[in-house]
């Protein structure tokens, strides 16, 4: 796996003078959104890596998940947002210090737009994936109900209340 484990990055790289804090904060906000959209949970710092790519005088950063066993399983919305895990707090603090809420929302919209573009590029594959995910019962009915209620309230969308599987919720989210 290419990249520095998130917990090592936080401990050993976050205070480097050559760290481009704004780029890292922007990428973490986008990573947070990718996890939420995909319902990829348990993104504690040891479950992702940070790739650093030299780009002229600065580095580019890309945060990538490396543990997928908690995808579309839990019933709590916060479980799918890396910002709520204690060991990610130093990066979350960096984000809140450098990026205002409006800009953060813009990055989230940008990430959702990119995901939508990828979806539209492969409609046949997405249709097959959706069919498989919506038929599979990977979580308990109680967790499906709880998450559909939380996301319905968050998005102000009653369609979530009709979801019967985590696959249904994932594709609506």
Go through the PLM ranges and name each one.
Residues 1-7:
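Short pocket-lining segment of the protein kinase catalytic domain that shapes the ATP-binding cleft
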